[in-house]
Structure formats: C-alpha cells, structure tokens
Swiss-Prot record:
Signal peptide: none annotated. Disulfide bonds: none annotated. Pfam families: Ribosomal_S24e (PF01282). The keyword Ribonucleoprotein applies. This is Small ribosomal subunit protein eS24. The gene is rps24e. Keywords: Ribonucleoprotein, Ribosomal protein. PANTHER family: 40S RIBOSOMAL PROTEIN S24 (PTHR10496). One of its GO terms (molecular function) is structural constituent of ribosome. SUPFAM superfamilies: Ribosomal proteins S24e, L23 and L15e. Belongs to the eukaryotic ribosomal protein eS24 family. It comes from the Archaea.
Amino acid sequence: MEVDILSEDENSMLHRTDIQFEIAHEDATPSRLSVRDSLAAKINKDSDEVVVHKLDTKFGMRKTIGYAKVYDSPQSARQVEQDYMLKRNKIEIESEDEDSAAEGA
C-alpha cells in the first residue's frame, strides 16, 4: 500500500493539519486502521494523532482517495473530534468519570 499526500492545510485554531491523500493498493480497499497507521508512519506522527474521516474508492479502481485530520497531540484529537469518529479510529475516549476522579485527587 502506497500513500501519497495530495494536499495539506494547516488549521492552527484547532491544532491540526487537514490532509487529502491517495492510496494505491493491490487488493480490496484497506481498512481504516491500516490506512491510519500507514499515514502516521508517512508523516512521522503517532497513530493516536491521526483521525481518518473519509475513504472513497471508485468501483473497479485500485486507488482510494481519503481525508484525514492530523492533530498536534492525542489530547487535542480527543477534545475536538466527536466520540463516534474516535471510536471508528480506535482512539481511546476519556470518560467524564475518569476526568472528575483525576481532578478530585
């Protein structure tokens, strides 16, 4: 699987970079997690800082166009992203009970 970055847009207000990328693959469309790991390796980031939003493969093609958000830190990703998107990308969600317990200690 080969990842090519098509465009990068810096979003300093949300501490992230929006990336459009293209993947050339031999078999079926790769999973979201394998794409996330490959993209993170390509840009030298931790996989918890990368949130893949969209993967689009045209029928019969061996190319996938995708959209991802790369955050400065995993905490920034947890603060900004919606819970369902964090679950799709297997990024651990901090619960409110843990937060209140940590603040009380």
